[in-house]
Each structure stands twice: as structure tokens, then as C-alpha cells.
């Protein structure tokens, strides 16, 4: 490596960036992300288009490969997520607060993208479908069985190219550090 450039193991990236930030040294991470399993997804802009601020959010995400979208209720965060899915064209895990949200995401994806019902799975207390686009609840992922996060381990083992955290401020921090 060049002077002033450090190489770290992939598993340590997040921890190192957190520690550097704590001491006032934000890290510039150029490692990027793994692309995940390819899966064709297109926006079905039939009679609608993304609003300029939604398009801007998707463009910024595409340039950096990650991001947090903060918009008021009703401003179309789900559409931004769908557009990010269409940009990445990869398998996607969407984490939501409850089954009502899961079904709202499913309905919007079916209405606003080229995805079919066969491509979208629900992974919750009521259903255990793992598909190229899987919508799971935080609750099922944090459920322990014999001291283990069995559902989290199952979904973590898959090659997701994109993970969408809906209502990220409600995310159970001890599990998703």
C-alpha cells in the first residue's frame, strides 16, 4: 500500500470507521460493496415518475453505493427504495417494522416495478418465504431460538446485493451493530 493507506479485513471495516469517528477522524472508505446475486428489476413508470427530490436521492445512492433517505411521511421513501432496487438490479432484503408494512411494500413493488408475486417473499411470524426480493420484519430477525438468532443467520447467509432498512430509527441496535 501507499503511505497513509491502510488495508483492513472486511469484517473490521464498520468497527474501525466507528472508532475513528469517535476520535474525530472520519474514514474515507473506498472498498465498495459486494454486488450480490443479480436480479432484473425495472421501475414501471406507467403514468407516474419519480419526483425530482426522489430522483436526486436515488442518484446520490447510486454514486456512493449506500445512504440514508430521510423524508417526511407520505414523501415517497418506498418509491426511492424501489428505484434503488431498479438501479442495483440485485437481490434485495427489505427490513420492516411489522407485517402491515411488509404488505404495503409488497403492494407498492408490484404496482411500481416489474416484479411479480413469485419474485417477492415475506419472512415474518406468519410466513417464511425467501425469494429474490424478501421483505422481513425486524421482530422475526431478532427472535432467539435456543439462544441463537436463527432467522438472522439464515438471511445473513444469502448473497443480498441491497438491504433496505425501513424506519431505520426503530432498528434493534444490539443485533444490527
What are these regions, as identified by a protein language model?
Residues 63-88:
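Walker A/P-loop
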Residues 124-134:
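Conserved motor-coupling elements within RecA-like helicase/translocase cores
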Residues 69, 94, 134-136, 163:
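Hydrophobic positions in the central parallel beta-sheet of the AAA+
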Residues 99-126:
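Conserved helix-turn-beta segment of the N-terminal RecA-like "Helicase ATP-binding" lobe
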Residues 91-98:
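Conserved RecA-like ASCE P-loop NTPase motor core of nucleic-acid helicases/translocases
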Residues 1-37:
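Interdomain "pre-motor" coupling segment immediately N-terminal to P-loop NTPase/helicase cores
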Residues 35-70:
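Conserved pre-motif I regulatory segment
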